[in-house]
Each structure stands twice: as C-alpha cells, then as structure tokens.
Amino acid sequence: MNNIKSFFGKKKKTQDQAEPLVIGDDSEKRTVILPPPSPNAVKRKNKNEKPYSIDLNGVGEVGGKVYNNVVGVFADGNDTGEISPTIYCVSDFQGLLKNDRKWIQYSELPEGYTVFYFQTILCVLNFLRRREFVHYIYVDKFEQILEMNENNENIITTVIPTNPIDENDKINSKSINDGDDNGGGSGGGGDNSPLTNVILPTITTTDTTTTSITISPPPKNHLSLLEEDIKNNQNLHHKQQQLQQLQQLKQQHLQQQQKLKQEQQQEQQQQQEDEPNKSPVSTSSTLSPQLESTNFEMTNDDTSLNAPNAMLTPNNISGISYSIIYPGKKKRIDFSRIFVSPGHSFRFPEEYDKALEKHLNEGNPKEHFKNLDFEARGGFGSVFCAKNKNPHSAYDKQMVALKKMPIKTLRHKRMNLSEIGFLKYFNHPNIVKFLCAYQKSNDELWMIMEFLSGGTLKNAASNFKFCERKIAYVCREILQGLDYLHKQNIAHRDLKSANVMVNDKGEIKLIDFGLCIDFSIEKEEINMLGSPSYISPEMINGNPHSLSTDIWSFGICALEMLLGKLPYHDSRLKAMVFVATNNLNLPLLLSTTTSSLEFRDFLTNCLQFDPSKRLTSSQLLQHPFLTKACPIKDFKEILPALYMSNTLSNMF
C-alpha cells in the first residue's frame, strides 16, 4: 500500500515547481508600476492583512489606504473580477524579478536565448505569472522617446525632472507576492521588495478617468549590451562572426521598428478619418511589437504626477522621467457575446436575461439531483458525480456529471453561459452530451452532462504504453470531434489530454468548452489562452490564431501518447519558449522511439510552425496512419486497468 501511495501521491517538484525565492535588492534594473486604484474604496476585513495584498477579494492597500483593484471591462463601471497586475518595465534579463531570473536559469535554455529571444521570454512569463498579477513590459532605449518627438510633430512628450523626496512622504511597503504560476509557489518575499519606498503624491486633479504613472529611463537595450560583450571578446575569429551576426540583428530590429512605425501611422490616419475629434498618441514604438496590444499612450499633462496612483521608485527618485497611461487588458473578440448557434448569439450584458431563458431549465436543481462525489476542478467550475432522484424524469436514477459554475462576475456569467450554449448546440458522439442546466442561485449555475466513467487520456498516457494501433484509434476519434467543430467554424482552444475522456465503453469524448469560440463572424483572434504545454506558437508570439490552433494542440496530445509524457515536461517555460521560437525539435523527440514513418509524417503535419501549413482535421482523417487504428474491442482491453488507476489516484 505504501508503494501505491508513493506512486499516485504527490510527485516531486520539478524545476517549474521550485520553492519561491527571496527577492533581492535589484530594483535599479527595472521600473515598478502599481495597479490603478478604483474610485470605490473598500475597507479591510482583516486588520492583520499585509500593507499590500491582492488576495481573495482583489483589495490592495498602500500606505494605510485601501483600494479596490478590480478592473471592469465595460464602460458602465461594472467589474469583471479581474485584478490589474503590477507592471515591471524592463529592457534585459537583469531587470527581471529574482524569482523569474532563477526560473529561467533552472529551465536551462540554450545560451543566447535570454538575449536573442528576450521579448518572447517576457510574453511567456506574462502568461505563466498571470495569476500572481505580474506583468512585464519591454522598453527599448530611452533615446527612442526623444526620436519620436523629432519624427512626429504632433506628439509632445512631457519630460519632467523629478523632485527630491521629502522624508515625510516616504511610505514603507512590504513585498508583493512574486511566485510562479502553479509551478513556482504563490508566496515570495520578506521585506526585500523591488518597491522599497512608495510615494503617493497629493491629488490635485478631478479627472480620474485615466491613470498616469512615472517611469524612469531604462538601461541599455540588449543589442547594446551584446555589442559590448563582443568587443571585449579576445578571440578575433569568433569576434568577426559575432559582429556580422550582430549587424544582421540590428538590421532586423530596424526593419521591425520601421514596419511598426508605418503601421502606427496608418492606424493613426485611419483613426483620424473615423474620429476627427480624437487624436490618441501611441508609444508602442518604444515597446516590443509582440506587446503592441497593451496600448500605452503618452500624455503631455504636467499634472500626471498628481494622479491617484502616480508612483515613484528608487530608480527614479532623481533625474529624468516620463509619464504613460496604465494599459488595459486586451478583450476577446467574443467578450460581448453569448453563443446560441454558429453566427448567432445574444449580446452581453444587454441580453443576458434572454440568454438565461434560452439556455436554462426552470426549477430548483436540488429537487432533481443529489451530489455524490467530487470528481474534478477546472478553470470554470467544479464537477461532481450526481444521481437523478426524480423517478418521472427522462434520466430516471441515472448517474450524471454535475458541473457547478460560478457567475459572481461579468466574465463568469458570459463564459459559463456561453459554454452551456455551445454544449446545448453540439450533437456528436465524440463530444460529451449535454442534458440540462439550471440557475442554482444568483451566484451559481448547475450544468448536467452525461457521466463518463473511466478516466482521462492524461491518466491513460501517464500509466500505459500505447502501441501505434491504439494511438491511431484515439487520434481518429478526437479528430472526428474536432472536424465536427471546425466544419461549423468553432474552435475548442483548450484541447489537451486532460480534456479528452475515455468512458467504460471505450468511447473517446471531448469535454470542457469554456474557451470555445465561434469564428463564423471573425475568422481569427489575437490572444494567448489555454494550457501552457499545448498552446500553439502563433498564440505565444501574439499572432492571429484560428481553427488550426486546435491541430497543434491535438498534435501535442498524440506526441504525449507516444512518449508517455509531454515534450519538455520538466519546464513549462522552456516548452513554451521552444515552441514560440520554432525549436520543438520533433526529430530529436522521436529519435528515442520506434515510431513508424506514417506516424512521424502524421505528427509533422500537425506540428507545423506555420499554421497555414498544418493539415486540417478533414485532411488528417484521410491520413494513412489512421488506417492502423485498432477496433474498439481491442482498445477496451486497457479500460479495467485505466479505471483502477484513476480510482487509486483519487484515493490518495
């Protein structure tokens, strides 16, 4: 029994799950921007709370003043439960928080990655650290700000020398949690915070619609530092090669900046034509092209230092600073829609009541269903095994899966009601069957689905060695479900082995449609979402994604069945950076296997870096590899052992 416990118990922490490290005093390498406060102040319930906390209720306190840091998506001021992150403006590896520097070192990225792919690493860190409300912004050379003034007569950037700090204005601040998302702990800390002294200037303006903060000049950019290292190199032969490579990088960097500048000019020209009375000024030329969507804007108002959350850091106590407006979170293209059918939806929040009437059943669900056992917890609710106790219903004494879905925020209301809409519309043997849905209370929905005994594909892949015939069977069944979605311009966007169920009949079914999206109107979107190891390269790089993003995730699932584990499973950060930089290295991963040429070709067509080169679900269903699929009776041989392993893992 002890051996069984050790096998199914908690696994040893990997590099991504190391204990949080104490933050060192390296704040001079970055600039810190605290989240903008809401005008609605909220008092602390716990007097022992830390001076700055962003725990359960999204309430942050600075210097004895408590602010509600919840940011609303809609203009009417309703909040969505989203908490603004703390922004760190950095220009090189040394500007990262100590936790993140150590994380990157533990990931053992190849030499030079932190220089050549630094902006990609920032995008990955922002995604993995989103639950700790940490967000990095790449800022290039400060000279670019002055260059913008010379090249754009309409842009007036305020350059303000900051005043010396009076001792009476200093406020000591405790450290802000700095752990790694899911895999690096949630604590951090001590008093060695990157923000050691916070200044709250006096509020002298009545306009609180925009929030301004101050940022100090960043250090030299990565190309300048690289050039210094090359010049100090004593090896003349390698120095010449490195200088040539550096020159190519500079040309690429210049081309990117010129292209970005042209796009901005075209966008500004279009905005002026559409809204002649508005002239927003963007400073994204000082930021990474991949982070262009953060929509920073320059301000020429000297009162920006008197804004509610204007903060000064130890790095800009004296010298030159400039002000920007705090960035807003990028919205999903379907943020104002609740799905009904492809191309049709309810407007949210205006038609929320109509959506409730359309998607939900009347009555109290507790009169019909009884909770039995907890099964799983996901990003959009908790799933329980339940039993129908109404003898006159269509599901008499039937075991069902009951998903409890919170609707406390606008985001929860839209996403969870949309998931109900998607499942209610779907009708396919490879997709979990929707039964009914109820509103349990003002804070919770109950969705009833068919109960799938057995386990997930993740359980199966980690406990059994799949032969190619069984892999082909699973791949064919998943693709049939995907093909049904894609033919209706619907993408799953969270396809992973944990969202593929195997029931006691050997049937394969897709579950969890919380991130599902209808591409009938817009054909693509720019957003990063899903599970780290399964996210496509176009998502990580901030490029438009569409239906083909599911094909990449499907290819990772197939590779996981072959290897028995995810590629680069020891580090999510490393896996995502490799995917984003076209360095998955499929031939190397397959070199340790005895896979056939057909299977290798099948995987290669799924895991193409360029999404336009990936085969579609319909094309993959015609691939010769799938002709190897075993009959369902042969696949059912693994079910008893799979069911037992799933039961034991739930026990311990």
Curated annotation (Swiss-Prot):
Q: Name one GO cellular component term.
A: cytoplasm
Reactions it catalyzes: L-seryl-[protein] + ATP = O-phospho-L-seryl-[protein] + ADP + H(+); L-threonyl-[protein] + ATP = O-phospho-L-threonyl-[protein] + ADP + H(+)
For the protein in the UniProt heading, the enzyme class is transferase
The alphabetical list of record keywords is:
ATP-binding, Coiled coil, Kinase, Magnesium, Metal-binding, Nucleotide-binding, Serine/threonine-protein kinase, Transferase
Instruction: Read off the CDD domains from this record.
Output: PKc_STE
Catalytic center residues: D494
Q: Which InterPro entries match?
A: Kinase-like_dom_sf, PAK3-like, Prot_kinase_dom, Ser/Thr_kinase_AS
| Start and end residues of each stretch annotated as Disordered | 1-47, 163-198, 257-289
One matching Pfam family is Pkinase
Segments of skewed composition (Low complexity): 257-271
Which residues does UniProt call coiled coil? 231-275
List, as start-end ranges, the regions of compositional bias called Gly residues.
Answer: 182-191
Source superkingdom: Eukaryota
The coenzyme or cofactor needed here is: Mg(2+)
UniProt lists compositionally biased (Polar residues) regions at: 279-289
Question: Domain named Protein kinase: which ranges?
Answer: 369-626
| SUPFAM superfamilies, sorted | Protein kinase-like (PK-like)
Q: Which SMART domains match?
A: S_TKc (SM00220)
What GO molecular function annotations does the UniProt record carry, in alphabetical order?
Answer: ATP binding; metal ion binding; protein serine kinase activity; protein serine/threonine kinase activity
Gene3D superfamilies found in the cross-reference section: Phosphorylase Kinase, domain 1, Transferase(Phosphotransferase) domain 1
- Binding positions for ATP per the UniProt entry: E375, A376, R377, G378, G379, F380, G381, S382, V383, K403
Q: Which family does it belong to?
A: Belongs to the protein kinase superfamily. STE Ser/Thr protein kinase family. STE20 subfamily.
- The name under which this protein is listed is Probable serine/threonine-protein kinase mkcD
* Biological source species: Dictyostelium discoideum (Social amoeba)
Lineage runs: Eukaryota, Amoebozoa, Evosea, Eumycetozoa, Dictyostelia
Its gene name is: mkcD
